[in-house]
From Swiss-Prot:
Keywords: Bacterial flagellum
Main location: other
Name this protein carries in UniProt: Flagellar hook protein FlgE
Source organism of the structure: Treponema phagedenis
One GO CC term, this protein: cytosol
Matches recorded under SUPFAM superfamilies: Flagellar hook protein flgE
Family matches, as PROSITE patterns: FLAGELLA_BB_ROD
Gene this chain is encoded by: flgE
Record localization: Bacterial flagellum basal body
Length: 463
């Protein structure tokens, strides 16, 4: 039999394999996160008719005579290039821009995918809605009122408890910043309402008690008569009920004696110090904190029958600086509270996912807190992963073990919520490869036809 017959058969068989891969690529042109396949060929073993000989004194060397026996598939690679990103606006749709895989769990089995079309089941678990596999990451822990995500722990299911209640939190810190106008006139004795409006700067801000009830915090600044760079600050919680709340302020104490303090500035307009009515002065450097306290109306009295008081810090900024600090320059007054940490009771209404994969819950009371963080897996040889169907991969002997971290670390890409990575199949390339494959298949068939004709000629010699 002629060797060319078997070579032609191998050509047809292996080009059929290549066509199968191309057909699968084309079929998955719109599959989320799909990575195209690629077939590489190599020749089969060659039959040696004669070996090579070295040159001698009389004649030169002779090359070997070898006849190839066909072609075989060298490899079928998965090409992990980036697919195009498509915006969906759905906050559970997540794309990886760069390297990395999402981690899915089915019981104890781990799967990996770049298809981030996720959803939330009835228990709030973030899942792949097509098969129920659970997305892995790290849940935040509440440690002394702070949400901490420990990414060195084992990964776990991510749960987004929509509708979950968050307890009210009393205000513990109120931060003030911006400017007091040095040109503001001193407040004269016996001042009328017009004089007060011209000579003071008042700012209101909402704070919360332990029940989550909202209170108005009012701070009024006025120039200290006979001084250049001092202001009298008067603090009241619920100013319309001053007798009930009995606001008091002090430095280094949870309960002062009066509701006023003196703010001093240096000759450069920067915050210098604060003095309370007891003569206590803040440190010459660092943050300037004044402790304010008030009666919580409606709370049970303490064991001695005294009203329950709530204390919080008034943060005026850092001495000697201008950033996030009260200053005194010859510009209009703009000082106001810009931040406080209390809130009323609320319910989880929505969530968002940032580029590092941190899931932040947004509550009905305006508060937000971290819920968890998505994990990404990387591999030394991602081409060595085995396809497991349903847009997933599993670890193999040649992929290496999964290196699990957050996004943006150790070569992993960033996450983009509201976006999906599409298939990386390029139809132009696939149709071109299809034509080449078809011609290769036809060439193999032609080899068989020609060999058959030659054999027929040999058989006809007998006639």
């Amino acid at each position: 039999m002629m060797r060319s017959l078997f070579s032609g058969v191998s050509g047809m068989q292996n080009h059929q394999t290549r066509m199968d891969v191309i057909g699968n690529n084309v079929a998955n042109v719109n599959t989320t996160g799909f990575k195209r396949g690629r077939v590489n060929f190599q020749d089969l073993i060659s039959q040696q008719l004669s070996g090579a000989s070295r040159p001698n004194e009389e004649v030169g060397g002779v090359n070997p005579k070898e006849v190839g026996l066909g072609v075989m598939v060298a490899s079928i690679d998965t090409v992990h290039t980036q697919g195009a990103l498509q915006t969906t606006g759905i906050n559970t749709d997540i794309a990886i821009q760069g390297n990395g895989f999402f981690i899915l769990k089915d019981g104890e089995k781990s799967f990996y995918t770049t298809a981030g079309a996720f959803g939330v089941d009835r228990d709030g678990t973030l899942v792949n809605p097509a098969n129920g596999m659970r997305v892995q990451g790290w849940m935040a822990e509440d440690i002394e009122g702070q949400q901490i995500i420990n990414t060195s722990d084992q990964t776990e299911d991510l749960i987004i408890p929509i509708g979950q209640k968050i307890d009210a939190k009393a205000t513990t810190d109120v931060a003030y910043a911006c400017n007091l106008d040095k040109r503001l006139p001193e407040l004269p004795e016996g001042a009328n309402q017009a004089d007060i409006l011209r000579s003071t700067w008042a700012t209101d801000f909402n704070v919360y008690d332990t029940f989550g009830e909202q209170h108005k915090l009012q701070m009024v600044f006025s120039r200290v008569p006979g001084t250049n760079n001092q202001w009298l600050a008067t603090v009241n919680v619920d100013p319309e009920n001053q007798a009930g709340t009995e606001t008091r302020v002090g430095i280094g104490t949870t309960d002062g004696t009066e509701n006023t303090f003196i703010v001093s500035f240096d000759n450069y307009g920067h915050l210098a110090s604060v003095t309370d009515t007891a003569g206590n002065v803040t440190a010459p450097a660092g943050q300037v904190l004044v402790q304010a306290s008030y009666n919580v109306v409606g709370a049970n009295p303490d064991e001695g029958g005294a009203p329950t008081r709530h204390t919080f810090n008034i943060n005026l900024g850092e001495i000697g600086t201008s950033r996030n600090t009260i200053t005194q320059f010859a510009e209009r007054s703009t000082t106001k509270a810009y931040q406080q940490d209390g809130y009323a009771m609320g319910y989880l209404e929505n969530f968002k996912i940032d580029q590092s994969g941190i899931i932040t819950g947004v509550y009905s009371n305006g508060a937000s807190r971290e819920i968890g963080q998505l994990a990404l897996a990387g591999f030394a040889n991602q081409g060595g992963l085995e396809k497991a169907g349903e847009n997933t991969y599993i670890q193999s002997n040649n992929s290496g073990i999964a290196n699990i971290t957050v996004s943006g670390v150790m070569g992993k890409g960033k996450l983009i919520a509201g976006t999906l990575e599409m298939s990386n199949v390029d139809l132009t390339d696939q149709f071109t490869d299809m034509i080449i494959t078809q011609r290769g298949f036809q060439a193999g068939a032609k080899t068989i036809q020609t060999s058959d004709t030659m054999l027929e000629t040999v058989l006809n010699l007998k006639r």
